[in-house]
């Protein structure tokens, strides 16, 4: 089992694509600053799985964590998305209670990746580097 967090890619609906769309449509966005975690680029998760699969042995059972390296709030993530996308949109930090959600979200959801790195020799890049690749791909394909 591989657990992940804050998953995004060039495809489907996700936070990166939503922030880019809203950043183009609005002059100001309010984004939660008191929930911290680590974004995970789906391409990096897929590459990690491909790296791990040949190393799986019969009877191996464990839970691993995978996300990109580094830590940020949703606000930090949104700012990076808007900046890397070259958009001029004001982003204001708000507290979780100011943005009602159907699901309760933990204030700290950073995953410890030491086990997956040790057991499978995985190197993981920083979330900002992965985000740059995703945004470059989105812009290259006019998404």
Identify the residue ranges that each predicted region occupies.
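NAD(P)-dependent short-chain dehydrogenase/reductase
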Residues: 1-37, 43-44, 50-51
């Amino acid at each position: 089992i591989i657990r992940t967090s804050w998953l995004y890619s060039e495809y489907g609906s996700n936070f990166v694509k939503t922030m880019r769309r809203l950043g183009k449509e609005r002059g100001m966005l309010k984004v939660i600053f008191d929930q911290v975690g680590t974004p995970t680029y789906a391409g990096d998760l897929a590459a990690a799985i491909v790296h791990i699969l040949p190393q799986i042995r019969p009877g191996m059972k464990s839970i691993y964590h995978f996300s990109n390296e580094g830590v940020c709030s949703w606000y930090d993530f949104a700012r990076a998305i808007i900046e890397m996308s070259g958009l001029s949109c004001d982003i204001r930090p708000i507290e979780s209670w100011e943005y009602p959600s159907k699901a309760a979200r933990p204030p700290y959801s950073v995953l410890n990746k030491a086990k997956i790195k040790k057991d499978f020799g995985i190197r993981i890049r920083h979330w900002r580097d992965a985000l740059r690749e995703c945004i470059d791909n989105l812009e290259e394909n006019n998404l």
